[in-house]
A protein has these predicted regions:
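Gram-positive cell-envelope targeting signals
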Residues: 1-35
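Generic N-terminal leader/processing signal
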Residues: 1, 5, 25-27, 83-85, ...
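N-terminal, intrinsically disordered, polar/charged segments of Gram-positive cell-envelope systems
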Residues: 28-97
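Well-ordered beta-sheet/strand-loop patches within structured domains
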Residues: 28, 57-63, 70, 81, ...
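Generic structural signal of hydrophobic/aromatic residues within well-ordered alpha-helices
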Residues: 38, 42-43, 97, 101, ...
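Feature for intrinsically disordered/low-complexity regulatory segments and propeptides
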Residues: 99-111
């Protein structure tokens, strides 16, 4: 009896399937098409002909999207509206959107094709909740403690677009009146405190001694160092000593002191400024800066090794270099204890750089120049007749070369010749008491 009943039930089910298939449109031939039609029938049974409605909860607020009919301005638009069921009820739209997703289209594209006003709704919400990130900021105070003040960065926030369309799709597949909570994602800042911290490494430090200089020359060295102090260079930015320090004039604060003109020491405004430029030049070399312009004096200065001086003259000779470190560079130039000091801060150097001065050839030192102190400028009145005093040492002419040695993990990996120079001889000066 049970077997007979089972056979009757199976036969009836088979007949029902055949009859259902016979009444389907002719174009539905595949299993996928059959599934799509089943979705459409299910949607019609559940949703009827309601319009889609979406309520979004975010930041303690709610806003609602209600599907609206769109008027067609021309035949082409009318065709698009019809094909995408833009003005249809929810049941047809939900089924069509699901078909698109099943065929590999993204949920956003599948929804927007039938709901063209949905993106502007999403953008409106996004603008209301979006908060831009705040980068970490760094202030350089060269003479302060600490030298660098770094603020913390803050993440921004924005609506998660992908999650929005995914949630809308899932909600509208369940019901024409959907409620979702808007998901958000963080926007990272472009610059973090850690990024700024990496740019505070002491890249190089160099100093020269000016303690035995005269009062006016000391003033000029110190003034020039003050004028270059606090310089900041972005990656790729160039520095000009003359542009930064300005004209060597009384109006610009400079005094008269010894300068080199035509191979002789004479009085002139700004004497000593070349010691400031030389100090800065050497620190720039050690910091890995790309030196664009630097030249030697006619006479070898006593405060630095040959081929490592940087003579400057406003309007003609300059010290120029470019920051090519991959980050910002901060320059601190100052004077302390009779020394001119230049420090470069920025990202850590790839190499430890060492200077090397080589004297290629050297001539004979010229005979000293003798001055009789007829006016009593150098000796006290009670000084013994015939007393001698040296007021300037002499030096021979020389040819020199400057090299930079690059060390990595304690090993010299390359050597680079940067310049070759010729220096004139310097006559020593002796003063005699008549």
């Amino acid at each position: 009896m049970k077997n007979a009943f089972g056979k009757i039930f199976a036969t009836a089910a088979a007949i029902a399937i055949v009859l259902f298939a016979a009444f389907l449109p002719a174009e539905i031939k595949t299993a996928r098409a059959f599934s799509d039609k089943a979705d459409e029938i299910a949607s019609e049974r559940i949703f009827g002909d309601q319009k889609s409605c979406l309520t979004v909860c975010y930041s303690g607020r709610t806003t609602t999207y209600t599907d609206e009919e769109i008027a067609a301005p021309d035949h082409e638009a009318e065709y698009e509206i019809h094909e995408n069921k833009i003005n249809s009820g929810h049941r047809e739209k939900a089924a069509l959107v699901k078909q698109r997703v099943n065929r590999g289209l993204s949920k956003k594209c599948a929804l927007v094709a039938s709901y063209p006003l949905l993106p502007s709704f999403f953008e409106k919400i996004s603008r209301e909740i979006e908060r831009l990130p705040k980068d970490s900021e760094m202030t350089f105070s060269p003479g302060g403690q600490p030298k660098f003040i770094i603020t913390r960065e803050k993440n921004g926030i924005k609506a998660d677009e992908r999650a929005f369309y995914s949630d809308v799709f899932a909600a509208w597949q369940r019901s024409p009146t959907a409620v979702i909570t808007l998901k958000t994602e963080q926007i990272p800042p472009a610059v973090t405190a850690a990024d700024n911290k990496k740019q505070t490494f002491l890249k190089a430090r160099f100093c020269t001694d000016y303690s035995r200089s005269g009062k006016n020359r000391k003033h000029n060295v110190e003034l020039a160092m003050q004028k270059t102090d606090g310089t900041e260079l972005s990656d790729g930015e160039s520095f000009s000593f003359n542009k930064t320090v300005g004209r060597r004039s009384g109006e610009n604060g400079f005094y008269e002191a010894k300068i080199i003109v035509g191979g002789e020491y004479v009085d002139g405004l700004g004497g000593g400024v070349c010691q400031a430029s030389t100090t800065l030049y050497n620190a720039a070399l050690l910091a890995g800066m790309n030196v664009d312009e630097a030249g030697s004096h006619t006479l070898a200065p006593s405060y630095v090794a040959p081929s490592f001086d940087a003579a400057v003259s406003y309007g003609s000779r300059d010290l120029k270099f470019t920051n090519c470190s991959g980050g910002r560079v901060f320059i601190h130039t100052y004077c302390s204890g009779g020394k001119a000091i230049a420090e470069f801060y920025g990202v850590e150097n790839k190499y430890h750089i060492v200077r090397k001065s080589v004297v290629v050839s050297q001539g004979e030192a010229p005979e000293d120049k003798l001055i009789i102190d007829e006016e009593g400028k150098y000796f006290a009145p009670d000084a013994e007749e015939g007393s001698m005093m040296r007021i300037r040492g002499g030096s021979a002419s020389l040819v020199s070369e400057g090299y930079l040695l690059y060390y990595e993990s304690g090993k010299c990996v390359k050597t680079r010749k940067i310049r070759s120079d010729k220096y004139m001889p310097v006559r020593g000066i002796l003063v005699k008491k008549p």
